[in-house]
Amino acid sequence: MESVIKTYDLTKRYGRHTVVNSLTLTVPQGSVYGFLGPNGAGKSTSMKMLLGLVHQTGGEVELLGQTMNEENRIALLRQTGSLIESPSGYLHLTARENLEIVADLKGVNHRDIGRVLDVVRLASDANRTVGQYSLGMKQRLGIAMALLGSPKLLILDEPTNGLDPAGMQEMRSLIASMPETTGATVLISSHLLGEMEQMVTQVGILNEGQLIFEGPLH
């Protein structure tokens, strides 16, 4: 099976403090890969390095078969969708209008908007203003924005944080179905093992910046 993400000795230090220490991992194509670890383990920093949002102190990132560098970073990220912070959107606009803005920024045809709304189960609420949405609906809208343009890779940093139990369950179901419904490989972080068991096919456990286990979950 081909790999969508590979890292080699990926390291991030701030002064004398090592946040991520020689991280070497492999995310197989077509998987939902769970990045599991307690708060402060280095999950978010690792994801930001994968996206080039944080510059690594050492090591390499390989995305979609290419070692990422300044020359190819933008081209690789055009094939990658992400939700790293809380989803952003204009609260006074509808979900569809928000997606039209993102589609224009990405250079994506507006015909793709209907597809992503169906994937995240927001088609019936597409013409409501985002200010009327629950947190779970806003999270799903954020994923819809990330899915515009049919990325090969989707990176999600703790997307169930702050959701009520019903919202958490809906989000888990949505993420577990992503490879089948969108063709995307998914990298998702969480600090909850029980949550991972409901979503992922592969898991990497991170503790104090080090990968201590990687392999199939079941």
Features from the language model and the residues they span:
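Short acidic-hydrophobic catalytic motif
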Residues: 218
